């Protein structure tokens, strides 16, 4: 397997710390709102990575955090705690807010076939006390570990204390901005507006490890006792504490978005060096953003985010979204529009239509996996998770002269990685389309040929009123039950 390591700024061979096993930490959601579709892209990407690693022979130990305290607005030390702010808006306590939005994470993961970090299908009704068993770590469950890390950094000379907080001194770290190669002088220019919030702060890039319950935070609802007084952890220490507590002071892969490159991930790396005397992460992977109509990043804080239920309300299937995300490499910016979703839906429906035809030809016999095609499939996966290349392998296989049952068995095997429900959709028993629906569909085709678009629209409406959806494909059309 070769993946793009942001530290090396190139695609490199993955060499596990322990032979045959990879340890992975996924930066997970801050649970103060329903994830927007830009967040979800990342989790689909890393789900496919997890599946690909298992498919190619690795054992995987993976965890994902759930940030339920200390993540400030605009990612600044002295912003508003996002969860406390949402609790105030909704008139609830912060834990109730976190619990509710964790339940929506489970719902969205289940709909999109995103496995739990442990590699199991997600039960959307899972009791939240079972989260840890499935590989999710809640920040509030690791406060003791965070305090222990801050104490160790303090002993090692990487921190200083003010009347408001305990800070990490970034000048003690060589190559602090290793991800962006930005100098501390440039960093100082970039954060100058924050100077003066704490007059005792030594450098604008220094960041909070522990915030005291004083000043604007004197009434902070979530707080714990510590050697530095009553308070709560900074955002960055949470990920360092959770990842190393579970995976150890060395682990293989850390994932996140490119928005983590300027601040969060340099701070995590600095904390690990300050605690252990060395970096903890061998490979850093970062996904790019989704863009919308104006090419602006889909961001909830900008008011342009769309949740999964909102997208599905437009008539799309969850697998249309999964297919779209799989069709573009995780490191490439992806335009998320109705047009791109329409294209993904048409491609997915066309694929299933072809598989159904092959299924009928196979006489429902089980076949054998075609090893030559499997080697091609794995080659694409190992090329920096080139999932679009695996879709091309499937396309080539569909055009081949191989036995129908072998084609199906091989593609079903590939779907262990893609998980587009290909077997279920291909072998559905309710896909016998009534003759009157087929007649309406063919009449719509003829109306379109005659450029009678008003009649064509009328026929489509009649089809949909009967509970079916007609989708145009390169081979003509397909019908599916709504």
Which residue ranges define each predicted feature?
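The substrate-binding groove and active-site-proximal loops of carbohydrate-active enzymes
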Residues: 85-94, 134-140, 229, 257
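Short, glycine/charge-rich beta-strand/loop segments that flank catalytic centers
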Residues: 63-69, 101-105, 115-146, 164-173
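Short, well-structured beta-strand/strand-turn elements
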Residues: 59-61, 156-163, 401, 469-471
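Alpha-helical recognition segments enriched in aromatics with Gly/Pro capping
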Residues: 1-32, 47, 112, 117-123, ...
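Structural preference for alpha-helix termini/caps and helix-kink/transition segments
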Residues: 296-300, 304-482
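N-terminal, positively charged nucleic-acid-binding surface of large information/translation enzymes
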Residues: 8-11, 17-111, 124-127, 472, ...
């Amino acid at each position: 397997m070769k993946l793009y390591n942001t530290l090396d700024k190139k695609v490199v061979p993955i060499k596990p710390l322990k032979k045959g096993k990879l340890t992975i930490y996924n930066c997970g959601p801050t649970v103060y709102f329903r994830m927007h579709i830009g967040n979800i892209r990342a989790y689909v990407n890393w789900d496919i990575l997890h599946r690909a690693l298992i498919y190619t022979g690795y054992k995987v130990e993976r965890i994902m955090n759930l940030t339920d305290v200390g993540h400030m607005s605009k990612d600044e030390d002295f912003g508003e705690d996002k969860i406390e702010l949402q609790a105030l808006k909704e008139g609830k306590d912060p834990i109730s807010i976190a619990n509710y939005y964790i339940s929506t994470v489970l719902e969205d993961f289940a709909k999109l076939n995103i496995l739990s970090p442990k590699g199991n299908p997600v039960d959307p009704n899972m009791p939240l006390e079972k989260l840890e068993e499935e590989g999710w770590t809640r920040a509030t469950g690791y406060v003791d570990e965070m305090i222990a890390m801050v104490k160790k950094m303090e002993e090692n000379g990487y921190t200083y204390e003010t009347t408001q907080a305990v800070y990490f001194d970034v000048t003690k770290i060589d190559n602090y901005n290793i991800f962006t190669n930005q100098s501390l002088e440039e960093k100082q220019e970039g954060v100058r507006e924050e100077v003066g919030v704490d007059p005792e702060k030594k450098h604008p890039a220094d960041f909070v490890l522990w915030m005291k319950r004083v000043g604007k935070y004197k009434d902070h609802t979530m707080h714990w006792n510590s050697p530095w007084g009553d308070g709560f952890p900074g955002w960055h220490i949470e990920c360092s504490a959770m990842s190393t507590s579970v995976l150890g002071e060395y682990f293989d892969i850390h994932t996140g978005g490119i928005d983590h490159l300027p601040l969060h991930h340099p701070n995590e790396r600095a904390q690990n060096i300050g605690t252990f005397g060395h970096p903890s992460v061998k490979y850093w992977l970062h996904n790019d953003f989704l863009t919308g109509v104006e090419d602006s990043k889909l961001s909830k804080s900008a008011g342009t985010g769309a949740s999964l239920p909102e997208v599905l309300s437009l008539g799309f299937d969850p697998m249309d979204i999964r297919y779209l995300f799989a069709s573009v490499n995780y490191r490439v910016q992806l335009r998320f529009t109705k047009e791109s979703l329409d294209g993904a839906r048409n491609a997915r429906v066309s694929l299933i239509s072809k598989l159904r035809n092959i299924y009928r030809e196979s006489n429902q016999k089980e076949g054998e996996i075609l090893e030559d095609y499997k080697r091609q499939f794995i080659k694409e996966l190992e090329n920096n998770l080139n999932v679009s290349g695996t879709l091309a392998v499937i396309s080539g296989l569909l055009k081949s002269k191989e036995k129908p049952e072998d084609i199906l068995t091989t593609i079903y095997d590939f779907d262990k990685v893609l998980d587009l429900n290909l077997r279920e959709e291909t072998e559905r028993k309710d896909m016998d389309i009534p003759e009157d629906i087929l007649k309406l569909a063919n009449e719509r085709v003829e109306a379109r040929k005659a450029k009678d678009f008003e009649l064509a629209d009328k026929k489509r409406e009649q089809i949909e009123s009967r509970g079916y959806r007609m989708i145009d494909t390169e081979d003509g059309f397909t019908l599916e039950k709504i």
